[in-house]
């Protein structure tokens, strides 16, 4: 039984080929992000990302702590750096994830955004030794409850599309 393959030559052909340039380093904390797991910091972190993109690209950082967030959209030329000690906690509210057209299980449909999204962007990245805690239990509990109801009606597979759940990371139609 092989637990780890030492041949990782394939790794060179996946992922970001280059990191965004570090023209600017912005702290999302200076935009109002609060290292308090009970405070929603989505707007502040997104403002830092957007400002970094408008400045020509660079890196967005956070001070160590726990940050509750909804959907974040990484822009071209921006690196969201989650250093050790930084934890992004996904909001348990589906309302913090705007819906848009995406591909789910091979089908184009409207679906909630992920916690971290890179869509139609170039040279965007997420790096660091920090943590993304998607806290998906609330969404999966809903799914399993709905699945019981659907199975009783012979509609097992429909629940997969009716019970919208937040994804952790979405990278779609992006390059470098």
Where do the model's predicted regions map?
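Extracellular/periplasmic carbohydrate-active domains that bind, remodel
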Residues: 4-176
């Amino acid at each position: 039984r092989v637990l780890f393959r030492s041949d990782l030559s394939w790794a060179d052909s996946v992922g970001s080929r280059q990191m965004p340039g570090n023209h600017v380093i912005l702290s999302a904390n200076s935009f109002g992000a609060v290292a308090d797991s009970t405070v929603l910091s989505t707007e502040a972190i997104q403002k830092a990302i957007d400002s970094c993109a408008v400045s020509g690209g660079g890196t967005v950082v956070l001070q160590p702590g726990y940050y509750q967030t909804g959907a974040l959209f990484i822009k071209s030329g921006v690196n969201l750096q989650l250093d050790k000690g930084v934890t992004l906690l996904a909001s348990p509210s589906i309302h913090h994830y705007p819906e848009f057209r995406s591909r789910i299980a091979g089908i184009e449909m409207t679906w909630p955004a992920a916690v971290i999204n890179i869509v139609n962007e170039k040279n965007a990245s997420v790096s660091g030794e920090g943590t993304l805690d998607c806290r998906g239990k609330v969404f999966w509990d809903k799914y399993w409850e709905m699945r019981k109801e659907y199975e009783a009606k012979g509609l097992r597979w429909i629940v997969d599309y009716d019970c919208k759940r937040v994804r952790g990371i979405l990278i779609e139609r992006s390059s470098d």
